[in-house]
Amino acid sequence: MRLNKYKDPLPLLVHSPNCRRYRSWQLLLGLLLLWPELCGGVNMQQFIQSLDMMRNGCMVKFKVPIEILNRIRDGDFDMEPNQDLLCYTKCVAQLAGVLTKKGEFSVSKAFAQVPIILPPELQTPAKNALTHCKEAQNAHKDTCAKVFYISKCMADFDRAHFKFP
């Protein structure tokens, strides 16, 4: 493919095999713009919008029925999870920036993200739930299961303040 130096190369990029990579960067940029560090966090409306964006980004990768996603959004993790549901929760954690390079859930990264991605009214309850549930992942070897069960623990600890994409 030869580029004419006077034409905009962006349309060629969008229709090229690298399009998925380009769209992934667009999604990442969009998520970063929703979490303004300099503004001191987000309000509840922005937080709910970011949950929707994370859900949309992860639900296309895993076959989890929308009914199940709606249940876990409000903290109902009382189900026998399949591998898709386990890895959906890991995908969300990855988008939230709380995984290590090895794909493990990091409690310290989660604490660091709390003031950035949560509205003020959810920050203290989230920190309390993280403190209570930090050991919940230790009983599991699979990284997807670790994230699912720490999320379940946090939901069970304080369902009134728990929200999940």
Annotate each language-model stretch with its function.
Residues M1-D8:
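PEST-like, low-complexity acidic/proline-rich intrinsically disordered segments
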Residues D8-P17, R21-G41:
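Cleavable N-terminal signal peptides of Sec/SRP-targeted secreted and luminal proteins
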Residues G30-P165:
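Mature extracellular/luminal domains of secreted and GPI-anchored eukaryotic proteins, especially small
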